[in-house]
Amino acid sequence: MFSRSILLRSVRKSLGRYYSSQAHPQTYIYNLLSDTKCRSCGIQLQDKFPDKPGYYRLPGQNDSNTDNKAKTSELNKKYEKILQNLDISDRNLLINNFSAPKQDDEKVTSVPSLQQITPVEADTRDTTKDQQTHSGHSLSCKRCNDVIYNSKTRSIYDPNRDNLNKSEFPIPKLQQVLSTIPVDAPLVYVFSANDFPMGINKDIFQYRPPQQIYFVMTKSDILIPKTNVAFYNNFKKFLQNYMFKKFNVPRENVFIASGKDRWKMTDLYHFIPNYSYIIGDTNCGKSTLVKSLLINHHVKHWKYEARQQRPDEKQSSSASLKNKDFKKLDRLIDSFSSKNGPGTSHIPGFTRDVLPVDIDGIKELFDVPGFTTNENLQDIFDKLNHKQIARITKGANTSKYGSLKSKFDTVKNGQVLSLNGVGYLQFPGQDSMYQIRNVTKFALHKFKNLEKVDSILQRNEIPKSMSSHFIVNRQQQQQQRNELRGYYKRYIIPPFYGTIDLVIKDIGYINIKPTGKKLTNELMVLYLHPSLEAIIRQPILNYIDPPTPKKSPDGTNRKTITSDISKTPFYSRLIPSTVLSDPSSLVLSPPSSDYNQLNQYLQIDESSESAYNDLLELDETNKYDYWIE
């Protein structure tokens, strides 16, 4: 039975590649090269040039260019001496049983390298393919192995480490990515629920009509509880209406799923067309989504086999699994995930080339490198290690941290809210008060004002009691102080009435709710590291758990909030502001200066009634007049 299933799988895969080649010759080329690509990032593998991309080493292969050089114990030396006296057939048999003695902190050096196994003039791709067949699963390049196993506590872009610097994590532009995709191939655009709608690049519609693109929101587990069907249906309806009214995307072309929790994977399998290319912003969750589809298919087979191994029990697809079956299933998933691509990582630019992924011998997808519009995206990661990146990009659960019942903090009277030291949100003064709900993994801290922030950053060391509030290490505080004065970008938060979300790309959002009587028109200001981007939007919770519509004075029901999508802005860009005039001080600029910059940016005449100033009254009727999408 097993042999028959393998045969059918091979036939289906061959037929699939044949029909794919008829429609898309470029797709056929990707398939031909798939056996010699890194299973994690998709780059073409090679074993001859350690200083070039795609280099990989066999387990135990010595490499003079690495800091961790392979060591040979006395026991291994004796083993090698005995090995040399054996016949070739016996030697190969002994090597292949993987029984070479080794210590925990040592690498086996008795396994010959590729250069020793094959002639020097042999083609690198053939060598790679032979090794894949021999090992039983695909290979990963050295860069990917370094990221997975050696980057837990060090900067991921350390220039002193081989094959682990910015050049190894290229992030292309949208146009570059699309140039690698056949013009008539299906496109699936993946965007994250973590920073919606920032993950949707409107430039995509310059290359494809909206009717020909499928949109998938992933990471939805941080927005919607899996068990709450009503919340899911509410938000799905809103998202479909939003995509249709804003971009003319057919409602049936919009889907919501979670790659991390493998939520809605069976439905997603049927939603995505065959031979689709999976595109989206870097770090949006494309590879995780594709891998979850692959794992979901294998899980079905593993569950089926587990039930078949219990002949005395009723055989049905709904038969429950035992605890030992689930434990075995978890081990199988972990083992399968570690040996099969695509690779997943929190590091931007991890996927480097188009990577074909065969799901079940019938459906094949192509994982594509993520793109970005932010040229400074990688700068912040110079200061972070792998664990820090994983923490801040994980996202926080809305139902736990962003609901009306969630814990909140209070900011008032011109205080400054530090976003783990990579951003500073300056609140208005004059008896203002705000409730803050932190739906990010940032550690927030309140300072009295910007002068207090500056005084702390002037110190040689950050006090230990406050070190957790700054994500960068102590040696970088002086640099950060200088950056805050000039390098950090200054943004004016557009005027708002009621509650808003301040959304930070790839990170999450902070819910801001004014309380008490409004006494000032002074604007909020955000100082943000240039590697990060932010917007404000209407509270996302209103579209997950919509408030009950109030009745009009005539007794009729008012329209729901989702009916106003096309009439009011859902989000607004922040207003770029000029840098402080005095670089030696962080003295606050007068509110009138921010008013002028806001009016100029929105092209509003200072003398008109709609000009923003201290005399303007902001209410329900004009609260979106100063928002710009």
From Swiss-Prot:
Zinc found in the keyword field:
no
Ranges where the CP-type G domain occurs: 171-374
What name appears for this protein in its UniProt entry?
Genetic interactor of prohibitins 3, mitochondrial
Where does the record say this protein resides? Answer: Mitochondrion
- GO cellular-component terms in the record? mitochondrion
Q: Which family does it belong to?
A: Belongs to the TRAFAC class YlqF/YawG GTPase family. GEP3 subfamily.
Q: Say where the protein is mainly found.
A: mitochondrion
Can you name the source organism?
Candida albicans (strain WO-1)
Ranges for the region named Disordered are 104-138
